[in-house]
């Protein structure tokens, strides 16, 4: 029995977006969904109870960072990541590939894996498909990611073709090295940049290996929005309709809606938590930079249309004061609000799919959020 299964509930008649449910060893979650990122086994400033209160049923943790600190052996000794961090929902771990490949001046790619230097102390390290599986098996996440090559954007066709072929070979090695297929599902990652033929080749290679789910990688790496949307449009049809599809590293409201319309089920990004620590909040009318001086005497909530406990109890003036004074509680409030906002947005997306009106929802949301043509960057 596969530990990860996908149930397609319905498709939206306006857009073709999918309403579904993913079942894991640590519970089920409805899709499309957004996954908060807990890089170091914590979503910064949030407790597990905070995340449960906003109906976050799956979170993401980072293999590379947990390998370096505290080390996978300590987490294995603790009984796995769920026990270590007291989280009883589902956990997805990335493979560490993105972090290693982002150390472009500190790494060397070979067929066996990647040689690179620890960003903390300069120590020489080596990460391979086998090592990435070993670490993730020790962490015990519900969903593991294959170790892939993450090419830069833009990249020449020939470079990208060689990269796709290596990613396919590494995916096979990941499957062979995966020691816990009975209780951890391993997803393959489709690469290929903006080249349709290479996306097709990558998807077909991975689908032939019969992973329980598929990620679309190599997007949200600096390409324009229209390129991301175009790539999704020609990539998702190559993926099986009875398995979940995960768009990696995407978390702006417009990209979540556009991704869902193009058949994506799962998203993750540090965006809502990172901008929260800069005093930037997502609201139904676009971004609000609460640290700005104009909010010093503004006793309204961050978003009057928001039902989260932050908006019910705290004013912009108070939150601005906390952030200006570098008080952790201020970052906690903005983080809670932003995550609640995105999780609520995905709930609205699911309701719109259920009612066959996601196209209409997108139009009204984009207009109110300031994503019309006059102000396309307000995300």
Swiss-Prot record:
RNA binding, as annotated region: 249-255, 273-277
Enzyme class at the top of the EC tree: transferase
One Pfam family hit: TGT
Pathway of action: tRNA modification; tRNA-queuosine biosynthesis
Biological processes annotated in GO: queuosine biosynthetic process; tRNA wobble guanine modification; tRNA-guanine transglycosylation
Reactions this protein catalyses: 7-aminomethyl-7-carbaguanine + guanosine(34) in tRNA = 7-aminomethyl-7-carbaguanosine(34) in tRNA + guanine
Molecular function GO labels: metal ion binding; tRNA-guanosine(34) queuine transglycosylase activity
Keywords linked to the UniProt accession: Glycosyltransferase, Metal-binding, Queuosine biosynthesis, Transferase, tRNA processing, Zinc
EC annotation from Swiss-Prot or TrEMBL: 2.4.2.29
One Gene Ontology cellular component: cytosol
Positions that bind substrate: 94-98, 148, 191, 218
Cofactor list: Zn(2+)
Family: Belongs to the queuine tRNA-ribosyltransferase family.
Assembly and oligomerization: Homodimer. Within each dimer, one monomer is responsible for RNA recognition and catalysis, while the other monomer binds to the replacement base PreQ1.
Purpose of the protein: Catalyzes the base-exchange of a guanine (G) residue with the queuine precursor 7-aminomethyl-7-deazaguanine (PreQ1) at position 34 (anticodon wobble position) in tRNAs with GU(N) anticodons (tRNA-Asp, -Asn, -His and -Tyr). Catalysis occurs through a double-displacement mechanism. The nucleophile active site attacks the C1' of nucleotide 34 to detach the guanine base from the RNA, forming a covalent enzyme-RNA intermediate. The proton acceptor active site deprotonates the incoming PreQ1, allowing a nucleophilic attack on the C1' of the ribose to form the product.
NCBIfam families cross-referenced by the UniProt entry: Q_tRNA_tgt, tgt_general
Protein name from the UniProt record: Queuine tRNA-ribosyltransferase
Organism, scientific name: Oceanobacillus iheyensis (strain DSM 14371 / CIP 107618 / JCM 11309 / KCTC 3954 / HTE831)
Gene name of the encoded protein: tgt
